[in-house]
């Protein structure tokens, strides 16, 4: 994905400060300090880099328009929470089942926000070359949105087999690999990392879920 934003790991110093800034933002948003402090510097930087609050148990900022140039607040209703709880209940039996449930939860999010944002018109692998930012996510938007949704599911106690991991980056210009980012889940038992990548998929299509080791080799 092509855009002007730096890689997530571009500056170690910046991510350290971003982690502190993310805690401050969360505190101002009313998130308990203990929860805010649990954000890693890499996750906190997703939010501080575009001056938005991390998600709370009741709301999240939804980014679109490429690098979060457009944004909308999703206030979770009782119906939203019930729908996501039912979706995730199907994944309690195993880690693989939970990853499949997460795919359905991301599709739920896509359907929930599509008509509100206009992203029900979005295309797969969108970037600035499509000249339609108002209807699309770039990979920075999908990384932020998916990470936020996963953090909410985690806060609600709906992730039994996984924890939310640090976002991952790929992009090897020597082999013409396009720069790209994604959200990540970490298996609590095996510590294996799994990407949850919505950007390569169109509206209402399930996100890619695969081991990070495989994802970093794709384009």
Regions found by a protein language model. Give the residues of each.
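Bacterial N-terminal signal peptides
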Residues: 18-28
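Hydrophobic/aromatic-rich core segments of domains that either
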Residues: 151-215
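N-terminal secretory signal peptides that target proteins for export/translocation
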Residues: 1-12
